[in-house]
Amino acid sequence: MMPMILTVFLSNNEQILTEVPITPETTCRDVVEFCKEPGEGSCHLAEVWRGNERPIPFDHMMYEHLQKWGPRREEVKFFLRHEDSPTENSEQGGRQTQEQRTQRNVINVPGEKRTENGVGNPRVELTLSELQDMAARQQQQIENQQQMLVAKEQRLHFLKQQERRQQQSISENEKLQKLKERVEAQENKLKKIRAMRGQVDYSKIMNGNLSAEIERFSAMFQEKKQEVQTAILRVDQLSQQLEDLKKGKLNGFQSYNGKLTGPAAVELKRLYQELQIRNQLNQEQNSKLQQQKELLNKRNMEVAMMDKRISELRERLYGKKIQLNRVNGTSSPQSPLSTSGRVAAVGPYIQVPSAGSFPVLGDPIKPQSLSIASNAAHGRSKSANDGNWPTLKQNSSSSVKPVQVAGADWKDPSVEGSVKQGTVSSQPVPFSALGPTEKPGIEIGKVPPPIPGVGKQLPPSYGTYPSPTPLGPGSTSSLERRKEGSLPRPSAGLPSRQRPTLLPATGSTPQPGSSQQIQQRISVPPSPTYPPAGPPAFPAGDSKPELPLTVAIRPFLADKGSRPQSPRKGPQTVNSSSIYSMYLQQATPPKNYQPAAHSALNKSVKAVYGKPVLPSGSTSPSPLPFLHGSLSTGTPQPQPPSESTEKEPEQDGPAAPADGSTVESLPRPLSPTKLTPIVHSPLRYQSDADLEALRRKLANAPRPLKKRSSITEPEGPGGPNIQKLLYQRFNTLAGGMEGTPFYQPSPSQDFMGTLADVDNGNTNANGNLEELPPAQPTAPLPAEPAPSSDANDNELPSPEPEELICPQTTHQTAEPAEDNNNNVATVPTTEQIPSPVAEAPSPGEEQVPPAPLPPASHPPATSTNKRTNLKKPNSERTGHGLRVRFNPLALLLDASLEGEFDLVQRIIYEVEDPSKPNDEGITPLHNAVCAGHHHIVKFLLDFGVNVNAADSDGWTPLHCAASCNSVHLCKQLVESGAAIFASTISDIETAADKCEEMEEGYIQCSQFLYGVQEKLGVMNKGVAYALWDYEAQNSDELSFHEGDALTILRRKDESETEWWWARLGDREGYVPKNLLGLYPRIKPRQRTLA
């Protein structure tokens, strides 16, 4: 039986109570003893019902008493009274007399109360007021104790809750620690899996190479086995014949005195000797085979690693072709063999030779009237892209066809196209045909090939040039026709700019240039002013299909009544150090000087930064423009100015070939982002006699066409850049020679405006300015006038291309036409050819403009004019206030690469758009990141440049930072709004995939970038920021604008992995993850000079 619970109130205010369990044996006395305090006096239990109070006797059974109340038991309240029961008082009073009761009431009642209240001696008599005061004090003490008790209960409750929380937190910490350990274990497993994956790929490559080698050796062994079997059969036959001879049965001959005679003995001796030779040869071949096998096993590890790297670069280069065409807007289909491979701005550039890709060309045929001793004196140099350009005979109707490789998969159309020409000019001597000591310093095989420019529709065969068609003065220029053609223009964000290559004129050969290349980070697409009318042959067969020859000199063919073709018909390539003119060339001599020009000898000259080495640094080659033979017949022939400050007769006979052994060849570093130091060349310090002899040979050599927007080349038609001369004067590494400064005359109304660059707004046509010394003393460099002219229009009425323009040339009838890609003027109809001017005494002082030469049709030997910087009598001053001014974007690109922080801070306010790329999509931020200049990167990012600018292959600055394993730069770019999921075009790899595994910092950089990829859309409560605007294409997609904060609800699902489900405001839908970033993009700063 369950006991009842009796609630007993210990005071009248019903705040203090206790609960007593009641059993059938429980009496009222038990309840009182349970409830009263220890040591307390007499107490009794009273029940109150509806305001009536009745004491309960001590011997009363409480269980039965409660059952008597029944359902009304809840109305009854039991109180513990701290006094004797009234029933006992009444019984005691009945036995006493009335007096005794009166006396008791007077005396004893206070005593009882005193005893009840704990007052000690009952003999002490207290008045009623004292008793009331005492009761009030005790009541106050009771209330204080009750409050203390409540506070202690609350404290106990709080401690219990805290204890429960601590236990709960301890358990959660244990769970979290277990989860962390599990995550670390999984990360370690993931790292092991990635490492194993790399090992598996490496093993696959090794196994493939080994299996191929084993198959090759097995085939060789089978051949040797067959040869041995054939030899054994032959031995058996010979042995049988010998036995027959011994027995005397062969041809009826009998042995005479034991000796064999007659033709049989001679045949037997010959066969025996042949057998001995064959056995010896077989043994030698077996020993060589064994040695080769041992060498192969010895080098397998090295070859495997090299093959892996080569395959990666090959895939990267193969993937660049599509982007190259896209950047240049070329829509004609090209085979994989026909496009120039280009390495991105980051990562080493390695070319691997492979046979059978291009036809093998024979050694160049010596021109009919040229004497090139050095070509025959040395073998072909084995550069990575070794190939020979054939030399065609002058004025011949047939050409030598190059030898084709067996099994070559395409024919060489170059010679076939050349046969159709009426008059074919002599081809330039190929660089690779020169010996190793004679190579003109251009590392042909180690230069990243440039992007082909936007040109006309390519013919079916790569690089073929159809025969030129006549073009009258009123015909439409090539660029104007090209603008109306079907080829797409390059995008505005990545304008493809063209540069003129150096072209030899009719009957001339190029002057090889400097071997001291300053490594340029950006390969520049070429665009020659004078294209070849006959197609050149292609490089020989140990170059890769994706990597054509990186230095191609195209001939200029003068055909009567014909017009040179557009220079963009074929793969025009130049040296990677496109800032500098790396070789010289001769101009087309006037009509009446053709024999002398044809007999002039090609001389390999060591040049520095595109300038020829001249005697005492006093003069430079004359800037004669190329003259088209048939188009210049009606104009007076100019007199080629003398190269010397003395009168020199023109050499009619062929000059002796120069000794090319002094020309050095500097290797190019693998990384396209680093600049190679300049090595001093002994040729620079040649004696005056050697230089004088060289100067005589170069008397009629024209000034080579320059690349545009270069620190060392002119930016317009005004000749060499003044900065180049200052740079070379103050920097001994830059050549230490003095060149001839050229000044422009005041522009005529034919020239359209004064532009600092001939790009018509397309800045930095060259990519980078190399080795810019920002602190050198220079003269003010204001803008120079530049004509806006058609780049490839070769008709006569147009300004002179990138050459010195004298006052006499400004009144010509020019027909300028604009081209946004390549503004290089073409051949002018000039009555006079401007003459060069000797170099000024110092770079900063005012120069005297050049004095023009009078028109002349007599040989240059009769010329008495000297080039001087002195003002001649009766000469007018030209070039009033004209100075050279650099392209600000070109300076910004170069300064960000070189780490010139002060120059970056100054020049960035002059740049219209600091995020504007060059022709390969390289921005200043790319250069600063690749060079590791953290302070410049931070400045550019704070300035608000486009952090997600992509180059022609889709490489963003984040890709560059990842390829350098720079965690600091990666973090800086990500926090500035870099797109973590941006991928390249060729290999579709994000920045996390570009970390260099073999270099330092790979683990930290890879972990950071992969971590950001995994945390995007998870951390920051799932908020990611839009980096571009996007308009929804389907109903389930979400439109957003740049800077919107999107909440990623689901990173991937069954149907989509590249699209995430996100919420923007009250709308939800799919968003492409590669347009999202962990941080918003920094807005461009207000353009101010403050």
Curated annotation (Swiss-Prot):
Residues 382-401, 420-429, 506-522, 572-591 have a biased composition (Polar residues). This is Apoptosis-stimulating of p53 protein 1. In contrast to its official gene name, it is not a regulatory subunit of protein phosphatase 1. This name was given due to its similarity with a protein that binds to protein phosphatase 1. Residues 91-104, 453-478, 612-627 have a biased composition (Low complexity). Its main location: cytoplasm. The ankyrin repeats and the SH3 domain are required for specific interactions with TP53. It is found in: Cytoplasm; Nucleus. It comes from Homo sapiens. Belongs to the ASPP family. The modification Asymmetric dimethylarginine is found at R554. One of its GO terms (cellular component) is cytoplasm. Interacts with P53/TP53; the interaction promotes pro-apoptotic activity. Keywords: ANK repeat, Apoptosis, Cytoplasm, Methylation, Nucleus, Phosphoprotein, Repeat, SH3 domain. Reduced expression in breast carcinomas expressing a wild-type TP53 protein. Residues 525-538, 774-785, 849-858 have a biased composition (Pro residues). SUPFAM superfamilies: Ankyrin repeat (SSF48403), SH3-domain (SSF50044), Ubiquitin-like (SSF54236).
